[in-house]
From Swiss-Prot:
Binds 2 magnesium ions per subunit. Homodimer. Catalyzes the condensation of isopentenyl diphosphate (IPP) with allylic pyrophosphates generating different type of terpenoids. This is Isoprenyl transferase. GO terms for molecular function: ditrans,polycis-undecaprenyl-diphosphate synthase [(2E,6E)-farnesyl-diphosphate specific] activity; magnesium ion binding. Its cofactor is Mg(2+). Its EC number is 2.5.1.-. It comes from Brucella abortus biovar 1 (strain 9-941). The active site is at 12, 60 (proton acceptor). Mg(2+) binds at residues 12, 199. GO terms for biological process: polyprenol biosynthetic process. Substrate binds at residues 13-17, 25, 29, 57-59, 61, 63, 180, 186-188. InterPro entries: UPP_synth-like, UPP_synth-like_CS, UPP_synth-like_sf. NCBIfam families: PRK14830.1, PRK14834.1, uppS.
């Protein structure tokens, strides 16, 4: 199989990484940002077309207020510190998620990241912020319903393609590969519509330990698979894949 065009990552395990080292959760989030920087550079170096990162879920607001403040602070710091470098490296930034109820200063930062880089032609970095897939689908359905109510749309003409065109990810290809770190095996309300034919890779390492070598291993795993799209072609065995998962943490303490 050819290399993936679009990889999406659920960056999980910052808190557990910190706990295992006797550190506060905030230290795990800071380490996670360092891993994010490294992987964005690696993705660009490898010619990846699209990299989507689940940065902040719409459910994350229920976390302790101090942790939420830390996460928002890291987002703002990342954009202020890294946006110029992303722009120099020809990275285009796209933000998906609900923005209407965000604080004005956060909305301004997100808008700045998109507007500065919108002409870039390299890696498309898609940041899912205040994102929940069910909410995204509901908003798309409401948009279509308004068009129907206004007489602008015949209900019989609504198709999967039209729904896709009303999602936050309109114009972005569906992910070929979705990676989740930390050993959890669920999507957690991430790209539910778009993941219909994605390949999945659930890795045991926590996000701060994820390195370019692990990204390369994910590429190799993807190459071993046969995407069937409902067909009957065989795929690589799980035993074969297990040999190349998280090589950067082989023999290391969790």
């Amino acid at each position: 199989m050819s290399d993936p065009r679009h990889i999406a990552i659920i960056m999980d395990g910052n808190g557990r990484w910190a706990k295992a080292r006797g550190l506060p959760r905030s230290a795990g989030h800071r380490a996670g940002v360092e891993a994010l920087r490294e992987i964005v550079r690696a993705a660009g170096d490898r010619g990846l077309g699209y990299l989507t990162l689940f940065a902040f879920s719409s459910e994350n607001w229920t976390r302790p207020s101090g942790e939420v403040s830390d996460l928002l602070g890291l987002l703002k710091l990342f954009i202020r510190r890294d946006l110029a470098e992303l722009h120099r490296n020809n990275v285009r930034v796209n933000i998906i998620g609900e923005r209407a109820e965000l604080a004005a200063n956060i909305r301004a930062l997100l808008n700045e990241a998109e507007s500065l880089t919108h002409r870039n032609t390299g890696l498309n970095l898609v940041i899912a912020f205040n994102y929940g897939s069910r909410d995204e689908i509901v908003r798309a359905v409401r948009s279509l319903a308004r068009d129907v109510a206004a007489g602008l749309l015949d209900p019989s003409s609504i198709s999967a393609e039209l729904v896709s065109a009303n999602l936050d990810t309109a114009g972005i290809p569906d992910p070929d590969l979705i990676i989740r770190t930390s050993g959890e095996m669920r999507l957690s309300n991430f790209l539910l519509w778009q993941a219909a034919y994605s390949e999945f890779l659930f890795l045991p390492c926590h996000w701060p330990d994820f390195r370019p070598a692990d990204l390369d291993a994910a590429y190799e795993t993807f190459r071993q698979r046969e995407r069937r799209f409902g067909g009957v072609e065989p795929r690589a065995s799980a035993d074969a894949e297990e040999e190349i998962l998280c090589p950067s943490t082989k023999g290391a303490a969790v």
